[in-house]
Amino acid sequence: MASLKSIIRQGKQTRSDLKTLRNTGKVPAIVYGYGTKNTSVKVDEVEFIKVIREVGRNGVIELGVGSKTIKVMVSDYQFDPLKNQITHIDFLAINMTEERTVEVPVQLVGEAVGTKEGGVVEQPLFNLEVTATPDNIPESIEVDISELEINDSLSVEDIKVSGDFTIENEASDSIVTVVPPTEEPTEEEIEAMEGEAATEEPEVVGEEKEDESGEDQKEE
């Protein structure tokens, strides 16, 4: 569990105030939830990033708010890709004994045997829905794909996990599969396709009419 300090923001702030705040390396945030009143705070962006890298997206953070320390999770945050800047954070105060359902990323481990034969690994499911108390939520769920051959797949029911949490996805939900390589056409097939595409010159209707008209004039 990592710690992060915050400073309470007093009064109502304008857009200009928030812009100035962000330009000094601080991120406006709000704390709400279990056992606490909605409180506007600011945190250091660099320190926040360090904490998230340490505990993960669903990790528990001990957030200093005034004279109190509150256990929180990041409920949501906004990021500006143009400025490469976190613009706002929602901290949710939590009850450590109350279960929550969150999305946990799937991490593929190993190299599928089938890829050595040209197979391609496809992953239709990148996150799993997990229910657990905050301190039992895994940072990620590892799925070993090293034994997968071409046309093999793994579903939720196939993965082996350890920990005090429940995966809420359907057992049949596909996580990963190894598909056969796309076969490129042979030279003979390419020539055949080119032959089919080649057509005779279309009949020019205008020219025919001119010829027919000329013949009529000669007959006259």
Swiss-Prot record:
The keyword tRNA processing does not apply. Keywords: Ribonucleoprotein, Ribosomal protein, RNA-binding, rRNA-binding. Residues 184-220 have a biased composition (Acidic residues). One of its GO terms (molecular function) is structural constituent of ribosome. It comes from the Bacteria. GO terms for cellular component: cytosolic large ribosomal subunit. InterPro entries: Rbsml_bL25/Gln-tRNA_synth_N, Ribosomal_bL25/Gln-tRNA_synth, Ribosomal_bL25_b-dom, Ribosomal_bL25_C, Ribosomal_bL25_long, Ribosomal_L25_dom, Ribosomal_uL5_bac-type. Residues 179-220 are annotated as: Disordered. Gene3D superfamilies: Ribosomal protein L25, beta domain, Ribosomal Protein L25, Chain P. One of its GO terms (biological process) is translation. This is one of the proteins that binds to the 5S RNA in the ribosome where it forms part of the central protuberance. Belongs to the bacterial ribosomal protein bL25 family. CTC subfamily. Part of the 50S ribosomal subunit; part of the 5S rRNA/L5/L18/L25 subcomplex. Contacts the 5S rRNA. Binds to the 5S rRNA independently of L5 and L18. This is Large ribosomal subunit protein bL25. It comes from Staphylococcus saprophyticus subsp. saprophyticus (strain ATCC 15305 / DSM 20229 / NCIMB 8711 / NCTC 7292 / S-41). The gene is rplY.
